[in-house]
Amino acid sequence: MHQLEAERPDRMEEACGVFAVQASEQPVANLAYFGLYALQHRGQESAGIAVFNQGKVRLHKDMGLVSQVFDQDVLARMPGDLAIGHNRYSTTGSSRVCNAQPVVLMTRLGPFALAHNGNLVNAAELRERIDDGQVEFTSTTDSELIAFAVQQAVDRGLDWKAAITSAVSLCQ
């Protein structure tokens, strides 16, 4: 057997689907919808899209397939020029709407949205480090831990790039 063959699984392995888009001339919610639809095989438990518009974020997420979570009325109420979307295949946290992504948090620099595909092996340690008594966890996902790590770094005075770098450095 060749090394390349050994590295390829003989079955499909699932994980969440993440899609982001920035466009000023097109409705990004629609583009994110179609991106998530194309990635739907990656996760079919829940879907969500966060759209940024003039410093504010509009978030819509729910349980179900992309076509069940979003319709044209929902997408029309999500104007903006930047979007991030997520299809969930749960590996950490139960299959409940509170665990649907993206995660949106407020920081001193404004809103922040995060969608994550993967698992943290140090989630328990990261939760202990982040939980300063002020954090109100709303999910059981490790993705929320990353978002709170970014939020705390921003609120300590870091800019976006430094805050994200700091948060990622805590993740294993």
Where are these regions (language model features)?
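Conserved short alpha-helical segments that host acidic/polar catalytic motifs at enzyme active sites
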Residues: 1-172
